[in-house]
Amino acid sequence: FNPIFVSPSNHKYDIQDYDYIDPHIGKIVKDEGELLKRSEQGNLMCDPEHPNKNASRYICRVTDKENLEASNQFFADFVEEAHKRGMKVILDGVFNHCGSFNKWLDRECIYEDAPGYEKGAFVSQDSPYRSYFKFWEEIWPYNTYYDGWWGHDTLPKLNYEESDELFQYVMHIARKWVSPPYNVDGWRLDVAADLGHSAE
């Protein structure tokens, strides 16, 4: 499979949450809010700095634990059925970079006020995920000075050199999906040669 974890894109190489299967390809149980908020006059209302923060339906779909757990169960059932039919399931591991929507960074500020989530490293200097990224300036809140894969700020580079916590978390994720109840048969690593620091 191409990446199937929570992500705003169709290709899903800009992973938002490695812990859960995207409810848009899994199961949406709770579906509240609007795609984008509208004023009484019907105009779209957007925070110009963080327009995705206003997509309340998307935020509900991808942060609500009921949707996320249902999607993981859907995937576990799918893998079990694939194995019954003699098929192997290989996941695409995108561990070089994530997406700007990722809960660890949260450049889109969709987790900033979501219940049950820590502040992302873009939002807060005190984020538990700050070491997961290489920041070039000490400017918070909303620090835009971080390393992006090939310079793309929508694909924040993961900082393995300076974060043992990140390495351990990614190892946990890798083990999680090949263990019960998911039992995936293996991983294909995306841009494996780029893992770690890059010159750009």
Segments predicted by a language model, with ranges:
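Conserved residues at the C-terminal ends of beta-strands
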Residues: 2, 21, 190-192
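Substrate-binding/active-site clefts of carbohydrate-active enzymes
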Residues: 4-181
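Residues at alpha-helix caps and immediate loop-helix transition turns in enzyme cores, especially N-
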Residues: 14, 199-200
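Conserved beta-strand positions in the central sheet of alpha/beta enzyme cores
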Residues: 90, 188-190
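Acidic-and-aromatic substrate-binding clefts and catalytic sites of carbohydrate-active enzymes
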Residues: 97, 165, 193-199
